[in-house]
Amino acid sequence: MEKFVIEGKQRLTGRVKISGAKNAALPILAGALLTGGTVRLTEVPELTDIYTMLEVLKALGAKVTFSEGEVVLHTPEITSAEAPYEQVRKMRASFLVMGPLLARTGRARISLPGGCAIGARPIDLHLKGFEALGAKIEMGHGFIEATAPRLKGTTVYLDFPSVGATENIMMAAVLAEGQTIIENAAEEPEIVDLANFLNNMGAKIKGAGTKVIRITGVKDLDGVNHTVIPDRIEAGTFMIGAVATQGEVIVENVITDHLTPLIAKLIEAGAEVIEDEDQNALLVRSNGKLKPLDIKTLPYPGFPTDLQAQMMALLATVPGISVVTETVFENRFMHVTELNRMGAKIRIEGRSAFIEGVESLTGARVKATDLRAGAALVIAGLVADGVTEVGHIFHIDRGYERFEEKLRGLGAKIERVSD
């Protein structure tokens, strides 16, 4: 097991280039199964979750090469419609192959998914969508099987704007007969990126990024070249780190529109955020005179749940009382216990966390409970007095490419060591 050892009280200064978005790359990789042509993707981050997805695709018949951020995929035929348990148990997003498999072969069988243990995250929305398109769903011991000779377009209403369900149903519908309408669809930028990718292959999708997506089914899709959008959550993590450490960081390769709610909150707290449109970059700095905040996580375009933990690490040392309300996932305050071990004063009441700003945090031995909690503890370690050890950093490796290397480039004193 590896851990990060962090020496505190280090300002982050300099420039950092943001990687491609994991949450855009994963559904796009799954979507590559929809064509027998060659798919070439650039700006794919080198992360454990990406490698897991590539293993799933290989098991289904894809020929894959991956080097220096470029993936080339070719799946002339699907050799198996069953996603292997070994990979699926590691990562929930492997469930995204179900829509493409169903569309291309009429059958998909998959183990029940794993990944971060945050909340219920039910997959029933995906399954209801497939059923609406005409698939027959069978659930066995730890398995789900869907079969459909030919999917037929229909109207699907999502009870909750689930990102994964929107993506999976969209991919199933591109080869279905007739028109599919997804109502109360998720509006995340990663869905827009997936739709652009599919449309460039010959799909007919309109309305991605709005609450209603219309898909007209086509007979088949062609190969394509596509560049994955930048990772707004990685960008947000470095922006929050800059403010927390009273630093000055230029965050490069960002789409500012994707970061609107975070930028608004950082400015409200008293930080400075300046956009350089020509360079697709943001300058973020803070003199340390910050005000407490009220934050409520919401589906996009609201404040992202994936930045909630990092904001809490920042607010832990901001004078006054801040309130963070989590409405997207239950069980997403697991980092609070760890932050409190470092001297934070945070109490939880239902879905809200009340943060009483303390003068300083103290280095401690803590452990990442999930991906974003891990990033939050690293930020806390950079701010704290003394040395912090963050364990279970395999969680962090699932979503941040070369995290400690990028932080060292900004002046952080952080090392990866074997436990």
Curated annotation (Swiss-Prot):
Phosphoenolpyruvate binds at K22, N23. The active site is at C116. It comes from the Bacteria. UDP-N-acetyl-alpha-D-glucosamine binds at R92, R121, P122, I123, D124, L125, D306, V328. Pfam families: EPSP_synthase (PF00275). It is found in: Cytoplasm. It is an enzyme of class 2 (transferase). InterPro entries: Enolpyruvate_Tfrase_dom, Enolpyruvate_Tfrase_sf, MurA_subfamily, RNA3'P_cycl/enolpyr_Trfase_a/b, UDP_GlcNAc_COvinyl_MurA. The keyword Cell wall biogenesis/degradation applies. GO terms for molecular function: UDP-N-acetylglucosamine 1-carboxyvinyltransferase activity. Pathway: Cell wall biogenesis; peptidoglycan biosynthesis. CDD domains: UdpNAET (cd01555). Keywords: Cell cycle, Cell division, Cell shape, Cell wall biogenesis/degradation, Cytoplasm, Peptidoglycan synthesis, Pyruvate, Transferase. One of its GO terms (cellular component) is cytoplasm. Its EC number is 2.5.1.7. GO terms for biological process: cell division; cell wall organization; peptidoglycan biosynthetic process; regulation of cell shape; UDP-N-acetylgalactosamine biosynthetic process. The modification 2-(S-cysteinyl)pyruvic acid O-phosphothioketal is found at C116. It catalyses: phosphoenolpyruvate + UDP-N-acetyl-alpha-D-glucosamine = UDP-N-acetyl-3-O-(1-carboxyvinyl)-alpha-D-glucosamine + phosphate. SUPFAM superfamilies: EPT/RTPC-like. Belongs to the EPSP synthase family. MurA subfamily. Cell wall formation. Adds enolpyruvyl to UDP-N-acetylglucosamine. This is UDP-N-acetylglucosamine 1-carboxyvinyltransferase 2. It comes from Carboxydothermus hydrogenoformans (strain ATCC BAA-161 / DSM 6008 / Z-2901). The gene is murA2.
